[in-house]
Amino acid sequence: LNFALFWIIFYCLLAVPIMENFGDSSVFTFLFLLLFAIIITGFIKKYKLTDKYGLDGFPKDPKRYLYFIPVWILATGNLWGGLSLSYSGLSQLWAVLSMILIAYIEEIIFRGFLFKALLTKEGVKNAIIIVGVTFGIGHIVNIFVGQANFDTLVQIIFAIAWGFILVTIFYKSKSLIPGIIGHGLINAFS
């Protein structure tokens, strides 16, 4: 559990000031997130933890894919009212790539590290609840990067709901890959 909490706190302490100073459409934010993703992936590979944390590929049982279809459809919800770009030029590219990296990192530290740590101590039901709520409340840091209070509150509520969905998919499928894709789509389309 301490290991998971370390990564969550470490990520927040580094990401918040970078996002606050540069925004999510900056090449500096993208490079920080890329470096963080490389470090966390390197750690997992070095200690041969890809299987434990669900990064060794898609589930082997094709029936498990049925869980992903509704999630990936819902993940496109931000597009249902039409596509509107938030930035122009390279700023849009950096923002989209940053959002995908944020999804990758958050899936590993919340669904991978935290859920796996809680699973043995708290059991499935409690671990799912704790991770879902923790993930949602974790979005409160967006207040510190300039997001409006009401928008952050709405984001927290949606993040709690998505947190439950994504951790349940990870538990059922034993793979973080579908959650990374779904979370990445949600972030990229927001």
Listing of model-derived features with the role each one plays in the protein:
Residues 1-45, 64, 68-69, 93-94:
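Alpha-helical transmembrane segments in multi-pass membrane proteins
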Residues 12-21, 77-87, 140-146:
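Juxtamembrane "helix-exit" motif on the non-cytosolic side of transmembrane helices
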Residues 61-63, 89-92, 122-126, 151-152, ...:
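Membrane-helix interface segments
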Residues 97, 101, 130-137, 153, ...:
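Hydrophobic residues within alpha-helical transmembrane segments
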Residues 152-190:
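Functionally important transmembrane alpha-helices
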